Amino acid sequence: MSKSSFQNRIIRAAKLDSNLYEEVEADKGALWQAMAVVIFSSIAAGIGIGLKTGGFSGIITGSIASLISWYVWAYLTYFIGTKFLPEPQTQADLGELLRTIGFSSSPGLLRVFYFIPGVGVLVYLISSLWMLVAMIIAVRQALDYNSTLRAVGVCVIGYVIQIFVLVLIFSIFGGTLPDAPD
């Protein structure tokens, strides 16, 4: 796949193009692209926060954490969506969820603008909500759902489980959860 096709996929994912999510669901070769979108989105957030706070030490750690989180999130949505809340036509594998959810991170590229006084927080908030909507579409398409509400349910259940696991990990190994950007 050419560079322009990859860029086109990122743009289509950000435009919430459901056909794009079907396309990457079916393209087994798109896993590396999906991973790159997750990394780029994480780096963009790290740069935006770093430019505002004056520190860039968390970019690598944040990127690694984003990759782990992406995998865990894809597994949770796969498991919940195929085992607990499937529709009759639901047929998916973990790779399909990894690819679609990875591309749903594309609006997060805008988080690079977090440092801009007066609008940065708004850009960060809007891009985060945009990513959530993209993720719901990605989950709906990957799990072959007719119901967007069911995809929302899978995302909410997965989110609650992931937060519980994070709190458990931090309480066992120490440390605190990171603060949200202000």
What are these regions (language model features)?
Residues K52-T53, L85-P86, F115-V119, D144, ...:
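Short helix-capping/hinge motifs at transmembrane helix termini and TM-loop junctions
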Residues S2-A92:
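Selected alpha-helical membrane-embedding segments in polytopic membrane proteins
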Residues D27, D93, D144, D179-D182:
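Acidic-enriched, low-complexity/disordered segments with a strong bias for Aspartate over Glutamate
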Residues F164-D182:
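Juxtamembrane boundary at the C-terminal end of a transmembrane helix
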